[in-house]
Every structure is written in structure tokens, then in C-alpha cells.
């Protein structure tokens, strides 16, 4: 980016070329972006969050290290894993969904729900034991939404998150049931 501000990067994104290899290591169990060409950024000046992407944003290597997530505060774990769940649900419902994206999306949904049930029974100790499953589920959701896309939940949550600085997973949660009911 050669010292460019975020507005310049965003405007020139299609023409930017990476100058070095890219290794991505997620530190939450939410976005799955380590396997996509996509990122969400807060455009504070505009009062919104936006998605951005270009082929050079694909990682050369992506590494999942569940132990990095052991110390996540409960709130961060909850909001980031809800983001993964919403990614998976929106991607399987997307008109762009394929058998491939549905395979990964449905598997992510199953793993996340099963994980929540385990955490409910066993607390933080159980969460740490199955953190690898949450990392994989988030990764699967990333594979699914990276191709199929997201939809109304994300479109609405970007506005809430950008204007009021609500964490992405929390704003997704706030919109999720209302959007699915309609």
C-alpha cells in the first residue's frame, strides 16, 4: 500500500499488487477470511463497514492454530463464532450457492451448533477442548461464503457496526432472526 490511507487503498484495490507472500492465521473463530479474498473494514469517516476484496488478498498459506483462541474472552468467542454461523447460513441460502458451498456451509452450521451444546454443558474447559472444531467450522464457513456470498444480514449489520461501533458478530446476531423471519 506504500503508505496510502484506507480510502486510497479501497479506491485502488483492483489495481493493487502484492509484493510479498501472505500467510494468514486467524485469532478468532469467526470470519473464515483466511481462505477468501475478502476483508471487512470499518470506514469510520463514512459511518459504515464495507467488504472489500481482490485476488491478491488470497493467502498463499493459511494456518489454523486452535491454541491461539484458548484465551478469548467469552464475549469475543460468542460474537466471532456467531459471525461464522451467520456466514454459513447466509451462504447456503444464497442464490449463488453450489453443491460445494452447501457442503462446507452445512458442515460449519452442524459443527458450530454441536460446539455450542458442548460449551453449554462444560463451560470454558469444554470450549478449549473443542476450539479446533470451531476453527475448522469458521474456515468451512469462509470457504462457503467466499464463493456463495453473504446477504441481507451482513448488509444490515455493516451499517450498525460502522456507525455505532458494534462488533461484527454482535451486529449480525442483532439482524439474524429478523432477516430470516422475512
Range-by-range predicted roles:
Residues 1-66:
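Glycine/threonine-rich beta-strand-loop-alpha-helix active-site module
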Residues 38-148:
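Carboxylate- and glycine-rich phosphate/diphosphate-binding segment that chelates Mg2+/Mn2+
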Residues 86, 97, 159, 163, ...:
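Glycine-rich flexible loops
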Residues 109, 131, 135-138, 153, ...:
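A general structural signal for well-ordered alpha-helical packing
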Residues 113, 117, 157-161, 177-180:
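Amphipathic alpha-helical segments within well-ordered protein domains
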Residues 151-169:
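Histidine-centered catalytic micro-motifs
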Residues 163-182:
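Gly/Pro-rich interdomain helix-loop hinge
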Amino acid at each position: 500500500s506504500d503508505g496510502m490511507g484506507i480510502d486510497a487503498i479501497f479506491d485502488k484495490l483492483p489495481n493493487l499488487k502484492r509484493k510479498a507472500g501472505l500467510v494468514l492465521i486467524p485469532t478468532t473463530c469467526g470470519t473464515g477470511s483466511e481462505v477468501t479474498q475478502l476483508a471487512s473494514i470499518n470506514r469510520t469517516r463514512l459511518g459504515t463497514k464495507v467488504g472489500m476484496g481482490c485476488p491478491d488478498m488470497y493467502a498463499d498459506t493459511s494456518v489454523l492454530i486452535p491454541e491461539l483462541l484458548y484465551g478469548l474472552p467469552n464475549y469475543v468467542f460468542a460474537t466471532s463464532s456467531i459471525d461464522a454461523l451467520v456466514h454459513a447460513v447466509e451462504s447456503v441460502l444464497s442464490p449463488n450457492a453450489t453443491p460445494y458451498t452447501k457442503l462446507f456451509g452445512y458442515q460449519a452450521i452442524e459443527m458450530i451448533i454441536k460446539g455450542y451444546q458442548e460449551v453449554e454443558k462444560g463451560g470454558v474447559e469444554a470450549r478449549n477442548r473443542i476450539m479446533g472444531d470451531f476453527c475448522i467450522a469458521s474456515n468451512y464457513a469462509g470457504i462457503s461464503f467466499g464463493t456463495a456470498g453473504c446477504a441481507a444480514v451482513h448488509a444490515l449489520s455493516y451499517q450498525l457496526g460502522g456507525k455505532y461501533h458494534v462488533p461484527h458478530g454482535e451486529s449480525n446476531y442483532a439482524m439474524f432472526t429478523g432477516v430470516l423471519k422475512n
